[in-house]
Amino acid sequence: VAERVQAPDGAGTPLGPEWTNMLLITDNTDDEGEALGALGHGELWFHSDKAYIEEPHRGSFLYGIEIPSQGGHTKFSSLYAAYDNLPDEWKTRFSDTFVMHGYDYNGIKLDPDADLSNRLHFRQPMFFVNPDSGRTGLFVARLTAMRIEDLEREESIDILNRIFDITEDSAIVYEHVWRPGDLVMWDNWSCLHARTDWPEDQNRALRRCTIEGGRLW
């Protein structure tokens, strides 16, 4: 895999002490039933990696190793297109607005009123200008976005749900159907990604290398 994913100039810094030190994303287990990798089985909602920390990841590479006969696809949604599709009123109203992001590693969607004292969480701008493209993206995702700051709970929930519909509109989503040997890379600051479910009796394994990020504001 390492020979296939040599970093081009300006691509950023891979996380981990070695470029070959990549995360195995799989639901496979060893003979004793212990997990061999991370991010196990099943559907995973749209998200941007580590949106709930101060410096979200910049990008990622995924390399297909073991692919189920159906499902286990990776979807990508354009945050530029999502921003373009927002009502003009919202672009003005929320131009300086922040969204609180949090995540529960048990895969549970956190409640807007959840106690975050022992959870990873961070506030990110709703709109973000990508320094490479100069384009504005809508940095909001179903998996991690908890609440819109300075809004009442019910209005925040309502607007977030409407935003999720915009970011997940099939017109701006690409769905990658994996084959062994596929190598996919993406900009974590300009698109969201998600994972579809697959049969429980089948395995799925991919290698991931992540590019370290920075602050969005």
At which residue positions do the language-model features occur?
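Fe(II)/2-oxoglutarate oxygenase catalytic core
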Residues: V1-M185, W189-W217
